[in-house]
A protein has these predicted regions:
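Conserved, well-folded catalytic cores of nucleic-acid-processing
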Residues: 27, 76, 112, 116-119, ...
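Amphipathic coiled-coil/heptad-repeat helices and related helical stalk/stem segments
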Residues: 3, 70, 125-128, 153-157, ...
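A general structural motif
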Residues: 120-130, 203
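Von Willebrand factor type A / integrin I
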Residues: 138, 152, 156-244
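Short, contiguous acidic/charged loop-to-helix segments that flank catalytic cores in large enzymes
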Residues: 59-62, 116-120, 143-152, 160, ...
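An amphipathic, basic-hydrophobic helix/alpha-beta surface used to engage anionic
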Residues: 1-104, 139-144, 159-163, 210
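Short, charged loop segments at secondary-structure junctions
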Residues: 97-123
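Conserved phosphate/pyrophosphate-binding and hydrolysis machinery centered on Walker-type P-loop NTPases
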Residues: 59, 63, 99, 122, ...
Length: 244
């Protein structure tokens, strides 16, 4: 059930059938009717299940952390009257739970995510992009959980990320390696420790470079630790929502 709420300027992507011809004639530019349910945003968690998500921290893989964060974000989004959806992919597109806020939807998300496991294959971002564009006609906030160890691994996927961001608001979420953080935090005493320290610093620099490169292309990026993932993702969602 949708109730009429207001008339606004037509923008590309609005439903042509909703054009208000009387208001258009009066203002001499296209106007369209807005209904209450259109104010809700679509929030779609896209989870990479490829081998980059197999890394473990405290007995859980990065995939496990991404699943937990997706569940929390979906719940919060629906409480905020947004529609939550889920996609998973690895070397092929796998699951899709269309965005919704209906009763029982959270259970469907839970059941879909409960059975997920990482794959040994390299993830296919090309297939993901094609399916996102096919399944999501409405501009959505797409929260992509993946992992980029360095700028080179990200740049291979950058054309697809740019394409996704053109149609949607893309937030790329990836992980700080906690062991690297510990290496950087400790003062090296031996040559071997110094060598490890230098490598850890280089990895950390590469990840910061990934964030700045994505931002330079207008793509939101969140680099976080596994244990802070859910809180950081929720805060980022609320920040984005306050700006729309």
């Amino acid at each position: 059930h949708t109730e009429f709420e207001q008339i606004k300027d037509y923008v590309v992507g609005d439903d042509f059938r909703r054009i208000n011809w009387r208001a258009t004639a009066r203002t001499s530019h296209l106007m369209t009717n807005v209904y209450q349910d259109e104010r809700s945003q679509q929030v779609v968690c896209v989870i990479d299940k490829g081998r980059v998500m197999q890394q473990a921290f405290r007995g859980m893989t990065y995939l496990d952390y991404a699943i937990n964060a997706s569940l929390v974000l979906s719940y919060i989004a629906m409480r905020k009257e947004d529609k939550a959806g889920i996609m998973t992919f690895s070397d092929r597109f796998e699951d899709f739970v269309p965005p919704s806020a209906r009763r029982g939807h959270m259970q469907q998300i839970l059941e879909t995510l409960y059975r997920q496991q990482t794959q040994f294959a390299e993830s296919d971002f090309s297939a993901l992009t094609a399916h996102v564009n096919q399944h999501l006609s409405k501009r959505s906030l797409v929260v992509l959980y993946t992992n980029f160890a360095n700028k080179v691994s990200m740049e291979r996927q950058l054309p697809y990320l740019i394409q996704l961001n053109r149609r949607h608001r893309l937030l790329v979420v990836f992980f700080v390696d906690n062991e690297l953080k510990e290496y950087i935090a400790t003062r090296p005493d031996t040559d071997e420790e110094y060598y490890r320290h230098v490598i850890a610093e280089q990895f950390a620099y590469e990840q910061r470079l990934v964030v700045s490169t994505l931002k330079n292309h207008g793509i939101l990026a969140l680099l976080t630790t596994p244990e802070n993932l859910s809180v950081d993702v929720i805060n980022k969602y609320l920040e984005i929502k306050s700006q729309t």
